[in-house]
A protein has these predicted regions:
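Extracellular/periplasmic carbohydrate-active domains that bind, remodel
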Residues: 1-641
Length: 641
């Protein structure tokens, strides 16, 4: 916490150097990851603050802490080649920061970095200031942040993996982004933009997946840059007092352009859409109206349909704007209601057995806070109807079952490390579930909780190939120095691949919301398996990778919406099937991205296979390979029957 540094939080003392030093020290923690807690107060800044990879800034207190860029701070006025998108107040970087050293931008290998529960204000006299550069990858996020850009340039530049519950006021742009570092879609959930001078969002191949956005008092809500094909999905949004155009479009003649907008409420929006170059317009329908469906670009209405470029709009008049409902992503209970598992006796040292401490905590308490640590859990853990497990950093808050555990090995049915009850209203967040390598019956999580449940910011993996091995056996203490990789030890690792069950198993009526999930594990047969449920469910951003057989399987599933589904087929998964759908109906996939890495030496027949399915929608599909060969040798979707 910055309480450990000599800083004043009255907004008069420049704390730039102290804040940078605190971030640097946080980076030096075990695994190069950690949390810097920022107490309530006002923090004056005058220079760029570099946030190292794996480090999270989290504010706390009765009010959010506020970072303020001082008036006329040096360097935030002039536009140079290096500051064409603004000089950044906060810059997420790859690796650590060393004064005078080379600054490496956050990239496809930057994980876990985040900013949560803080506000930012840019004072006058900083016309080229941009609040945040966030070009990062999995489990990186900006969450519960309000940015007052004022007369500065932008709120967020080159966004990454996940943006949630953000509000941006002022600036030329709220968000100005190119594609994310891994080339995947960007999830923007529950956002508010007001008073931008050019547009709320400017995108250049950003692949934005936007749910519940409100843009007010701006010339343009969404602008796609010139000559740039893009995949834009929006649902349940509000445009209000948008003076010029709701959405500026470009390049419909490119098959890569796929725009799908649904349920966009408009008030005082005279022109909903404008196509650049051709000047084709979609005019508004009165003062207050709803765009129920808008399609622009490459489209096929059925498996038998020939894909073609379309422009299609459906509108209806409405009397009033209906407020957006974000009830499916509830806030955590107040911290005063949390019980710290360490206070109950858990060690989290990677050596001690914390199983019974967790079991007793579940019996007695509803809201269990799990601080950073390695918690050894040797038996299955089953939550009660209202149990919440709360972590704040999945890279450093690990529930680990070591290999060869009798409860998860041998013969028998799949056995979950963590199970939620049928119909439960559980919240599970900010933790890492790991069943090591040699646990043949292991499932990381069996989720049967109901529609009101919520999982987010959770990692599933055994992906660190060396971390959990020591002298040819699973490590007694995972914090021991990992073994060196030799031909013999490499064989030990690879023989464990694909021996466990699915990482996340949603079944028996399970549903609810799943946000910012990362499941990457060579040891599991699939990253996600959803089976036998018609309880409504929603996925807001999930990354699946490094599996050998399947990435995701849906069997007998109905009434789900999957936003921002991204698959990375890695070198060990040369014959991996990204998505199988079996006996499913009423599913929507929005911004579906699937790719094979550059190390692949052959194509694969299809990205999606279906059996006996109906009413399945794919709204924006990107199927590609960073390789010498294309992804599919057949088609993106293969209907087996």
């Amino acid at each position: 916490s910055t309480e450990n540094f000599n800083v004043k939080t009255d907004g008069r003392m420049d704390v730039s150097d102290a804040l940078q030093e605190a971030l640097n020290r946080t980076k030096q923690k075990e695994n190069g990851c950690g949390i810097l807690f920022i107490p309530e107060g006002v923090y004056k800044l005058s220079k760029t603050i570099y946030i190292p990879s794996g480090v999270r800034i989290i504010g706390y207190g009765g009010k959010r802490p506020v970072f303020v860029l001082a008036k006329q701070a040096p360097g935030f006025q002039e536009v140079t080649r290096e500051t064409a998108k603004g000089k950044y107040l906060f810059w997420f970087i790859g690796g650590g920061y060393r004064p005078g050293g080379r600054i490496g931008d956050a990239n496809a290998g930057t994980f876990y970095s985040s900013m949560m529960n803080v506000d930012i204000r840019i004072e006058d006299g900083n016309p080229n200031a941009s609040a945040i550069r966030a070009h990062f990858a999995q489990h990186c996020s900006i969450s519960n942040v309000t940015i007052h850009v004022g007369k500065g340039r932008a709120g967020i530049v080159d966004a990454g993996n996940h943006l949630e519950n953000i509000a941006i006021y002022g600036g030329e742009y709220g968000i100005d982004t190119d594609k994310s570092a891994p080339g995947w879609p960007i999830m923007l959930l529950n956002s508010y933009f007001e008073g931008q001078r050019r547009s709320a969002i400017l995108t250049n191949e950003g692949g934005l997946t936007i749910v519940r956005m409100r843009a007010k008092n701006v010339p343009v809500a969404i602008e796609i840059k010139e000559n740039a094909p893009d995949r834009l999905f929006m649902e349940d949004c509000i445009f209000e007092d948008v003076h010029h155009t709701g959405v500026i479009l470009t390049d419909a003649g490119n098959a890569a352009t796929q725009i799908n907008l649904r349920n966009i409420q408009c008030k005082n929006v005279p022109m909903f859409a404008l196509e650049r170059f051709t000047n084709k317009q979609v005019s508004g329908k009165g003062k207050t109206y709803r765009v129920t469906r808008f399609i622009f670009g490459f489209n096929a209405d059925s498996l038998e349909d020939t894909p073609q470029i379309v422009r299609r709009v459906e509108t209806e008049p409405i009397k009033n704007i209906t407020p957006l409902d974000a009830g499916d992503t509830p806030m955590l209970p107040a911290t005063e209601q949390w019980v710290n598992i360490r206070d109950l006796g858990a060690k989290g040292d990677g050596f001690s057995d914390d199983t019974h401490i967790f079991q007793e905590a579940v019996e007695k308490y509803a809201n269990i806070y799990i601080p950073q640590g390695w918690y050894i859990v040797k038996e299955p853990l089953t939550l009660k109807q209202n149990t919440n497990l709360i972590g704040l950093h999945p890279g450093t808050t690990i529930l680990l079952t070591l290999g060869g555990n009798l409860a998860f090995s041998g013969f028998g049915a799949p056995q979950a490390q963590l199970t939620t009850p049928q119909g439960g209203k559980n919240i599970v967040c900010g933790i890492f579930l790991n069943a090591d390598a040699y646990n043949y019956r292991a499932v990381n999580c069996k989720w049967m909780a109901g529609e009101g449940s919520y999982m987010y910011d959770v990692k599933f993996s055994g992906h660190d190939k060396a971390r959990f091995f020591h002298n040819g056996q699973s490590a007694v203490n995972p914090l021991e120095k990992p073994m060196s990789i030799t031909p013999e030890t490499h064989d030990l690792i690879t023989r464990a691949w694909d021996n466990q069950h699915w990482s996340l198993w949603i079944t028996n009526g399970g549903g609810g919301s799943f946000r910012d999930i990362w499941t990457a594990n060579e040891y599991s047969s699939a990253g996600l398996y959803i089976s036998h449920t018609d309880t409504p469910g929603r996925i807001y951003g999930m990354s699946l990778e490094h599996h050998l057989r399947n990435e995701a399987i849906f069997r007998n599933v109905a009434n789900w919406k999957i936003y921002d589904f991204q698959f990375e087929v890695e070198a060990e998964g040369i014959d991996t099937q990204p998505l199988d759908l079996i006996d499913c109906k009423n599913l929507t996939f929005a911004n579906f991205y699937s790719y094979r890495v550059s190390r692949m030496l052959k194509s694969y027949p299809s990205a999606i296979r279906t059996w006996n399915c109906k009413d399945i929608e794919f709204l924006n599909v990107h199927n590609y390979a960073h390789a010498r060969v294309k992804f599919t040798s057949n088609a993106s979707l293969y209907d087996v029957n």
